């Protein structure tokens, strides 16, 4: 299937290879002069600080192009108000490569509630405001102002997930493909190493970029559809059937009588294009102009797009934008293990550029001792965009390459303590897993290999991962190898030996997993397994932890306000959390990021996982209003007194008043009118909130730390001031003991570095691939 693909490490090198390898890719004319360069062949503009590490997109792309012989410069987080910063390295000989960074710039700058963030993990000292909104567009405009004739190549996750007309959460409307708004020459989607190397060499050979219309993994702006393709029209949901056709004049149709019977007329044979002719077939999506006014049609377009993501059988896409055509080529062929080893084996310095001095870059600090062992994810979660960006087929590194990187970390990273912080990827336990049938894999259009059940053609044997873990632990100078990436527990329970290996050697007290919800309705729309699977994994986890003599805890992640979630679903989740003694410290509402299936659900209020029709469709409830989204988030933090008024009001409206009170079965305590000030009784507190103080009995678990200060003799900072009078009151700051309560806070029987279950920081997740950890791009 890939015989005609040139491996990325076998291209003839560009003449500038004679300059050798730079210690860091230059960011100024002074650095260029030190390298003996008179100009750059390619300049990469990025919204992140420049860290020469394989978890950062600009470093991988820059080092890859350098390995092809090109002179590559970096303009990191430029001042975007004028063109001057974009001219600091001079005019590139070949093209500008533009990326917003490892994250979509809008997700980076705004919360799920559209509030401006004041920090940025990809910026020195965690400083916010160093990149513009829609950075890809702004950087493209400034590059065009600086050097009008230089080609512009878009890449990175922001461009990748906005390659077609898409719903934009921040403006609450459907926007054009970013390729049109940026006025760029070509867009590369996915990780894009293969497409980028081909584009660079073809431009270097003198080919005009406007002629590069058939490169896999690219999107281009054309005046008309390319010739030689059979176009299948999917721009409408329901087409009139041929038998429903009625001629304008009924007398034009000659009726037959019994005495006059014509011989059957030979009908022309029509040959339907086979899916195996994907190389010469394209699918027309609804136009941008139609999508921005028809939310049901948008759900249909999203469904069609997701069905065409298989790199072997997926077809090119065509979408009209006014009088122009957006042409999206087939998905890129996944990198082989040899190519993955080549990319991750490039000469990275593994530290931030020296120009940042001693400034801390939080994203780098998080991943400086982590190793990415694979790419891609076949989980297909609706709220996640990893599959749309990296693909469903897992791209693996060899064990030797991974061990070599661990040794590099040991030798190069300043202050290495002997701990590898993570050995994983988008999912911790998909290394060398995949379809056992190559023919089935080449033609499969399932959105997930594990939902609604694990495909019988999927290899779930974790032996390669187990062997890798054991080899990593043997590396000299390495004391501990952790697994911090999320574990897909429905896969893990298929291999008890893997769970035992993981729990015994690679969990540092807590293990992150993502059930995301407890109710079947939301879980089905998320394409996540039911809670029975979670319970089976929890049982195995606790069993092997006990056998290893360790007290370890699961940290579950949950999403609030996901499409398809009703108030009662969130209430049931909150009751489950309380029953299991979990208190979520960090919670996030669902974040509609471009191209996700769940984003299509959010906008269209329709299920795109099933066939979409105007009359016969599955409508789903969506929490869009600010108050309802606040309620869903508040229910995940049922233990926070600030959320109690909102939860009480909702429980009363839902007819669930019996869940308000001091009984162990209640979710929140009743309001204590006697403890309120007159202003609080008038509901005239700060920001119009009903600020309150509440007393609790010993029978209400989980609220001991929120006792009223004046009533209980607490100190000014709200902490207990010693022994308290009265039955069940806290002695010395400890929580009262009661059935079903979290373990006591004295830690007497707790191993170092661990907490009782429920005291971790589970957080609801809804961000695009590549955006939970900085290693994604």
Curated annotation (Swiss-Prot):
[4Fe-4S] cluster binds at residues 377, 381, 384. Its cofactor is [4Fe-4S] cluster. Residues 709-719 have a biased composition (Basic and acidic residues). Binds 1 [4Fe-4S] cluster. The cluster is coordinated with 3 cysteines and an exchangeable S-adenosyl-L-methionine. Residues 755-769 have a biased composition (Low complexity). Residues 675-777 are annotated as: Disordered. Signal peptide: none annotated. Residues 363-642 form the Radical SAM core domain. One of its GO terms (molecular function) is iron ion binding. Residues 680-698 have a biased composition (Basic residues). It comes from the Bacteria. Residues 736-747 have a biased composition (Polar residues). SUPFAM superfamilies: Radical SAM enzymes. Keywords: 4Fe-4S, Iron, Iron-sulfur, Metal-binding, S-adenosyl-L-methionine. Belongs to the UPF0313 family. This is UPF0313 protein VP1980. It comes from Vibrio parahaemolyticus serotype O3:K6 (strain RIMD 2210633). The lineage of its organism: Bacteria, Pseudomonadati, Pseudomonadota, Gammaproteobacteria, Vibrionales.
